[in-house]
Amino acid sequence: DYEDVNVKGLNAELRGYQKLGYRWLKNLDYYHLGGILADDMGLGKTVQILAVILSYVNENGKNAKPSIVICPSSLSLNWLNEVKKFAPSLKCIAIGGNAIQREKQIEKIPSCNIIITSYELLKRDIDLYKEKNYEFKYAIADEAQYIKNNNTQNARAIKVINAETRYALTGTPIENSLSELWSIFDYIMPGYLFGHKKFKEEYETPIVKDEDENAMDKLKQLIEPFVLRRVKKEVLTELPDKTVTVLYNEMGEEQKALYKSYLAIAKKEVKQEISENGFEKSQIKILSLLMRLRQICCHPSLFLSNYKGESSKLNQCIEVLKDAISSGHKICLLYTSDAADEL
């Protein structure tokens, strides 16, 4: 009965399909199994996971182990804000800053309910996690396509994390090959789909090269209990007319340093301009400087033609677009600068 789902402290009214997802995740956890929540973009994978974590903390109180969320760096702030919005009682920290700051944050993990870190920072800090040997209740790989290649540092690092139950969140469990699915399963339940060599021999090669339907049916039977995917058209009656999701973004170190440098220059120029001409006659100059700072926030190359670094906002935009396109959605992308079209 999915109607009796009531997680104390959850600031959200779960829809029917979300209650089903919550129960599915809880049942997997009960049997010490992992799973892939592969719902379509916009169906609330985050709130379903937070409901599970909050339920566990409610049941175990001070004895509750921390859980860890690993996501693209552009989504760390969004996860932090989602926790504050839907489960404010959970003690949560987002790992960030320089190496010394991150080490201090990692030392505080036992006193937290949720830890948020990025794939990039996990790779850098993995020796610290090994040294501390923390045991997490849940390890959640968001945008799990980041670990679809078993030979990457992302995949190797996340598999080191010691957790009772592992979940993967993705709208696209398979993008190019069955080996991607194997890699994600090797994270949530190591060994379940055998070693990579045996998996290729028994499933991937027969299915891809020989179009072996028997091998395909066997693989479907193996993975079906551990993959839950709902698309919007299946749950359309439960969705509101429009869903508004605000994504927050934090600049990377190079972009942030550039912004701070120009901010300091802008402050001096504004102070001098007002001193010489007064506020009323300085407004155009002030607006020009604000526009320059705004361009740096969007992408520094809009203002600096020789900038070769990244823009965290553009990276996040690309991730959202990829997720939407892979789910078959149509997209209307609006921007206020003609120069942004060239990015």
Report the location of each language-model feature.
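ASCE P-loop NTPase motor core, strongest for the SF2 helicase catalytic module
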Residues: 1-211, 220-337
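A short, hydrophobic C-terminal helix/tail in secreted or cell-surface proteins
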Residues: 338-343
